[in-house]
Every structure is written in C-alpha cells, then in structure tokens.
Amino acid sequence: MKVKVYYNLHKKCYSIVSLEKENYGKVIKHENCVPLFDAQFKVSEKGRQRVLREQKKNVHAYVVGTLVSQDEPNFWLTEYFPIKVATYNPYKYSSFVDAHSKKPLAKASQVLLSKRHFVGRQTSQIYYVA
C-alpha cells in the first residue's frame, strides 16, 4: 500500500496517510515504527518557508513509500547494505539529509521511521538503506 508518513507533533508518533484510491489523503494509522520500501523524502518548500517566517512547527516534511508489514522477513538486508540515519531540520536544511555526511536525500530502497525512549526522553529516528 502506497502511503506518506509524517511525525505527528500532537500525538508524538507517526501518522500514516493512504495514497490509495479508496482512502486517499486519510490518516489510516498512528504507529511508533513504520517500515517502508521504495521511499522518497519530500519537503514542501512553501511549508518550510512558513516555519522559518513564523518560527512555529507545521507538517511539511514526510516520507512516501510502500508500507511493509513489520513482520516482513528480511526487511533489513544489513549484511549487504549498511543502515544509515536520515534527519531533517527546517532551520538548517531544505531537504532530508544523511545525518553523518549532511548530503541531501531524495530516495531510499528501505526506510524505518522509529520512535523510541532514551533516558526518559522520546526521540525519533529515520533509518534508511540507500
């Protein structure tokens, strides 16, 4: 199923929006962990400019891809493809970037959007395989 996923600032989890004909544009799930195949990283420049102008967060960045069951065997082929971390900060970048190299990202074969607790604090990470 083709979806777009964004971090929901109010619910503190990922919202999954259907891009399929029947439920197009509707939030179909909220999850702490979302695996995707054939993903594209998207940022609305108009939304980003609004963040910069108003200094207030809004939903304008998301990942589009094919939703995968979390039970999918061999989702991560780490033996052959190293897992990397993606990040996005509208005050620093106009696109998603690799967290280490800071190079812009447009797409990835596999993505895992994950929320976790670390020392009493919630963090979200975007892992990807190029």
Residue map of PLM features:
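Short intrinsically disordered terminal tails
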Residues: M1, Y128-A130
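Structural detector for short beta-strands of small beta-barrel domains
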Residues: M1-N8
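A short, compositionally biased
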Residues: N8-S15
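Acidic, low-complexity, intrinsically disordered interaction modules
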Residues: S15-R121
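Short alpha-helical interface segments
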Residues: S124-Q125
